Amino acid sequence: RGEKLVTNPAESSQTAPDRGHIYTCGYSSASMRIMASRTSEVHAKFLLPYLRPGMRLLDCGCGPGSITVGLANTVAPGEAMGIDIAPVQLDLARAHAAEKAVTNVQFEVGDICDLPFPDSAFDAVFGHTILMQFQDPHPALAEVHRVLKPGGLVGFREPIFSNNLAEPPGSAQDQLWKLFGRVLAYNGGDIDMGRRL
């Protein structure tokens, strides 16, 4: 298929060819545990004061649904919809919602750049570390705008990893963040997307 395994992204082009969506964090058990530990109270705290009961909310790139389920509780009796490109994530999300007995939430396969919803379908759209997967977030944001009701609410939480402080410089943690940034850039993402919003 013309694909090449790159073990050292520093030796390759920093511009990724168009290979479709590549989720740099991957789906290892460690990565999935980290994603499942996220909560709306911490990771969507900035958005919570603006949400109201009865809203219809979309969570783009919902992963295992831990944030989505919390947002569903906030907008109840409204609805929350979580989308992700990885069915394995959605299986975990559905199980999490069932475990928490949250019934006003649904999960389905979806791509933020081609949302499977009609125009003006949501009162609010949220995303956590999803726009960082793209060098150009405009196609994703255009889709968000399309499915958002007039006057709707948009909230994305994106990183600015260049502001991370790892001491001492050159430590394993410092090297890890730099490597992650190079791999993310190679895969078509931007480790400092938060700076661009």
Give the residues covered by each predicted segment.
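Class I SAM-dependent methyltransferase Rossmann-like catalytic core
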Residues: 16-39
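Class I SAM-dependent methyltransferase SAM/SAH-binding core
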Residues: 19, 56-60, 64-114, 139
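Conserved alpha-helix/loop element of class I SAM-dependent methyltransferases that forms part
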Residues: 37-55, 70, 74
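A short acidic, Gly/Pro-enriched loop at the edge of an enzyme's catalytic core
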Residues: 113-124
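A short SAM/SAH-binding and catalytic strip from SAM-dependent methyltransferases
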Residues: 123-138
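A short glycine-rich, Lys/Arg-flanked "PGG" loop and its adjoining helix->strand segment in the class I
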Residues: 138-153
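Conserved catalytic/acceptor-binding region of the Class I
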Residues: 155-197
